[in-house]
Amino acid sequence: MPHGPLTVGSLTAEPGEKRYGVNEFPIDGKPYRLPMWLVNGRADGPTLVVTAGVHPAEYASIAAALEFGQMLDAAKVRGRVIVVPVMNLPAFTARSIYICPLDGKNLNRVFPGSASGTASEQIAAWVFENVMKRGDYFVDLHGGDLIEALVPFTIFYRTGETRVDDASLAMAKAFGIPILVSSETPGSTFSSASKAAIPAILAEAGGQGIWKADAVRAHTQGLTRLMRHLKMRSGGPPKPVRCRLLSKFQWLRSAHDGFWYPAVAVGARVRKGQELGRVTDWEGRVSQIAISPSAGQVLFIVSSLAINRTDPLLAVGV
């Protein structure tokens, strides 16, 4: 793209300028506030879009996006960076798990959204059209929610378009988290970006409502490594990290309301047919035994004793 002003909504950053501001746009007739940084480097280069807070209680990723936005220096950036630290602000202030309180929907299941849809669909549509489509590359930062424990991993989506897929895989490797997962989550940020020919990844680190320094660092260091990979900052290519590529992401869900007792630890290697945990009814009688559908690695576990029908229990990467 030609080097010039960087504009998103009502905010503009001139070349060599870093600007923080809040975009406002109507959602169901009421003003919706979206804070962001625009960093327009002095030297030309690609545009990187970074978002967090799609799932608003994944605090390590939000803290990392805040830190990353604060540390960026336009004088040292080649290209442009857009950072949205908390996309789902109403859910963040409500300390909500998974869903947006405006309509009860999971924002990361409705992309690319609809301008005439529900509140979450309208938010997704504005962000997709005005923020994500401005980028040459896209990163969405996540982690375990308030009731999820996980091992760090990075997801990318294979679209079948070689240029996009190769670039997304290279981004995932450059980010530096050793576990990579090839997966499509319908309605997600990263798969919607990839389908729009924007190479994209979703990085996971942290969880359970805690923002530990190592989880925040996994995200901020990953973003710094990625910028070096994209030649957006000095330092040369990042040192390669030996990665394990998983081709599937298998979720197990509860068939009942009740209590959840995991039988394995997050990160554990499991075999096909192995018992992974049990769901009991209110009396404590076993109503479901969760069995691993494949040999693989446990990537996340719901850490809440309380479980509802259709809730995720855990996921196995294969």
Residue ranges and their predicted role:
Residues 1-318:
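Structured catalytic-domain cores with a bias toward divalent-metal coordination
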